[in-house]
Amino acid sequence: LQVRAFADAYYTSTYYMSGLSMSADCSFDPLQIMLTEAHQLGLSVHAWVNPLRCQTDAQMEQMPEQYPISQWYADETKRGTWLVKSGDRWWLNPAYPEVRQLIADGVTELVTQYEIDGVQIDDYFYPTTDASFDAAAFAESGASDRSAWRKEQCNLMVQAMYNAVKQANPKVLFGISPQGTLSGNEKQSADVQTWGQTAGYCDYLLPQLYFGFQNSTAPFAETAAFWAEQVTCPDVTLWIGICTYK
């Protein structure tokens, strides 16, 4: 269940503004309604989060100023470093501890306020391979391999989210739903092999195999077999993400 698509919240949040698709006078809690109805039917609900993707300039300018991301957008020392524009929208930069802490705090809030069964990251990590996205942070790091360094920043973010979930409620699952191909994940600096082979990053990987069996680039059966080879940690489960239109 998507609960945070663009630095917003389809639930009651201290850290994120109300969902962009919700009316200003919305008097109900969409997440709580879904949890109540789903649990009555014996269904589990995993809160689906986009941790880094934010909003367009027009939307950011309308964001209430009590929220951290709005404050960072208004701060010339944070806009362009902690928040970076790529394409037509802004993105959080996971290279900064303060950014990772906000993301972790948002997860803690979800797990402590709601009886969710899991938290899942969507397949949006670094939005670009362009070096200008995080030039300042990379220069300050002293690292020489940008690709490896970016993967480490994503790993730190993922670990922070995993730890936040487990500290709030060890029974709640934490999962990641990456892109369905290794090449797609490499472009986003998503270190899926580490996540599938090392404890402490996630409880499950759910790659988005939105491909048919006859797909010329990533046929379903062969791609699923590839993922089965990547998830070797006994603490990590592989679930295959499918879509209803395939």
Each model region followed by its residue ranges:
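Catalytic domains of carbohydrate-active enzymes, especially glycoside hydrolases
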Residues: 1-9, 113-118, 198-205
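Surface-exposed substrate-engagement region within the catalytic domains
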Residues: 198-201, 213-246
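Substrate-binding cleft/loops of secretory-pathway carbohydrate-active enzymes
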Residues: 56, 168, 173-217, 223
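Conserved, mostly hydrophobic/aromatic
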Residues: 38, 103, 110, 119-122, ...
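Active-site-adjacent "subsite" loops/lids of carbohydrate-active enzymes
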Residues: 33-36, 46-47, 52-113
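Aromatic-lined carbohydrate-recognition surfaces of secreted/lumenal glycan-active proteins
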Residues: 39, 43-56, 120-128, 147-189, ...
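Aromatic- and glycine-enriched glycan-recognition loops and surfaces
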Residues: 19-41, 152-157
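Aromatic- and acidic-residue-enriched segments that line the glycan-binding/catalytic groove
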Residues: 11-23, 53-86, 124-143
